[in-house]
Amino acid sequence: MRIGQGVDVHAFGDGDKIVIGGVVIPYERGLVAHSDGDVLLHALCDALLGAAALGDIGKHFPDTDSAYKNACSRTLLRMVYSKLKAKGYSLVNADMTIVAQAPKMAPHISDMRAKIAEDLDTHIDNINVKATTTEQLGFNGRKEGITALATVLIK
């Protein structure tokens, strides 16, 4: 058994929607990113890579590589999981937290869990996503960006 953790942060910028956990959420702003800016899946990728001692998302999908410009993070997640499976690992469970003052995540969490479970070829009960705010404190509280944290157990 091996544990991995991941963290990602993206600032808000131009746009009218965000992608979190593979779910498109209408919002008054977008997220600044080289790919689709899915902070939750980026944190999850880092957690998986870390658990398998495979580095981090920046090593595998550098933001200097135009091949990953506007990349779908669900595709990146599936690629990461393929690397783990090639080393003989499989997911036991994943627990993730989204830190955002806005938009509200609760209406979208069940869809996020389903998409992540599909991408990791696991039962939805092995995937947990929760959301919290910072009670208007810090950059998340000022609605300047979104943070995501992920912890995984692999075997």
Curated annotation (Swiss-Prot):
| TM spans (from-to) | none
CC cofactor note: Binds 1 divalent metal cation per subunit.
Write down the top EC class of this protein: lyase
Lyase keyword on record: yes
Q: Which UniProt keywords apply?
A: Isoprene biosynthesis, Lyase, Metal-binding
Query: What Pfam families does this protein's entry cite?
Result: YgbB (PF02542)
Keyword Metal-binding in the entry? The reply is yes
Which cysteines in this chain are paired by disulphide bridges?
Answer: none
Site note Transition state stabilizer, residues: 34, 133
User: Gene3D superfamilies from the entry?
Assistant: 2-C-methyl-D-erythritol 2,4-cyclodiphosphate synthase
Q: Which InterPro entries match?
A: MECDP_synthase (IPR003526), MECDP_synthase_CS (IPR020555), MECDP_synthase_sf (IPR036571)
Which residues hold a divalent metal cation? 8, 10, 42
Swiss-Prot/TrEMBL catalytic activity: 4-CDP-2-C-methyl-D-erythritol 2-phosphate = 2-C-methyl-D-erythritol 2,4-cyclic diphosphate + CMP
* Molecular functions (GO terms): 2-C-methyl-D-erythritol 2,4-cyclodiphosphate synthase activity; metal ion binding
Provide the E.C. number(s) assigned to this enzyme: 4.6.1.12
Pathway as given in its UniProt record: Isoprenoid biosynthesis; isopentenyl diphosphate biosynthesis via DXP pathway; isopentenyl diphosphate from 1-deoxy-D-xylulose 5-phosphate: step 4/6
Binding site residues for 4-CDP-2-C-methyl-D-erythritol 2-phosphate: 8-10, 34-35, 56-58, 61-65, 100-106, 132-135, 139, 142
The cofactor required is: a divalent metal cation
Q: Which family does it belong to?
A: Belongs to the IspF family.
- What does this protein do, in the record's words? Involved in the biosynthesis of isopentenyl diphosphate (IPP) and dimethylallyl diphosphate (DMAPP), two major building blocks of isoprenoid compounds. Catalyzes the conversion of 4-diphosphocytidyl-2-C-methyl-D-erythritol 2-phosphate (CDP-ME2P) to 2-C-methyl-D-erythritol 2,4-cyclodiphosphate (ME-CPP) with a corresponding release of cytidine 5-monophosphate (CMP).
Assembly with partners or alone = Homotrimer.
* Protein name according to UniProt: 2-C-methyl-D-erythritol 2,4-cyclodiphosphate synthase
